[in-house]
Amino acid sequence: MKTRCCYPKRYLLLFFSLLVSVGSILMSVSLSSCSSSVKSPLLLSADSLMEIYPDSALSILESISSPQKLPRADRALYALLLTQARHKNYIALGDDSLIKTAVEYYGDKKKSVRAAKAHYYWGATYLEKGYTSFAVEEYLAAIRLMPIRNEFLAMIYDNLAECYEKDGLNNVAMEAYRTAYQILEGESAQVYPLRGIAGIFFSQNEKDSALYYYQQALDCALVVQDSSMIGAIYHDFAMIYNEKKDYIRADQYISKAIMVMGHDEAANAYLLKAEIMFNLNKLDSASYFFNYCCPIKLDNNKNSVLDC
């Protein structure tokens, strides 16, 4: 009996010692992992606010003193979030030294959302400077690094398509827009690739196809009452009907665009309105709208009156 009781005790002690050893290993791995994770609650707070309240996220990030003293993981996220917040708040990104901190930390080998975002915003920095080919390279890297198909991936494709379109590569631009649309199908954000697809058809003089996709884009914009996009699409309709010489319908759409657009957005709309009035042989109205658009042009670009 004693002999049989002795074995369980021995095994119990052995099991306990193994458990302690494994626990120590797991603890060290956990601590190692934690050392490379973000510690700043301000960064995590800014990250959580970024999509809906980018202005609040920017305020939080700008409140961080001495970001250069943050741990490496925190510095990388700070660089990424600050670039993202500036971009979302329409603030110039400047040079690429900030975002490169994030790019170097997150790398380009392992798929992760932050790695993809780092390369995307590096591309946005290049695009801001007019380096389209470098922007395309970084957008493609961002696509490769994205681990999931979501709205952010669709946005990358949409921006990639715009780059291709600028370079006159309409076929690959169309492919990128369609990929973005497939990812977003059924969501309100599909308005962007739909308008992009329509724009390519318009540039290829396929006006009926352009009208079809502009209508789909308009339907999406109306559902969410995106006034900026609604005004832009009304303007698109007016341009097509003006080219089709259907000046009555062109005037209807440009009038809708002007009603929806804000003062700063309406300069090109007033200029198109003047052209449509001229085509309708309403010369006094054409002169009125042409002269009306000039102060807006001057407000938006005080150094140039060439458009007026």
What are these regions (language model features)?
Residues K2-S32:
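Sec-dependent bacterial lipoprotein signal peptides
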Residues C34-C308:
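A "functional boundary" signal
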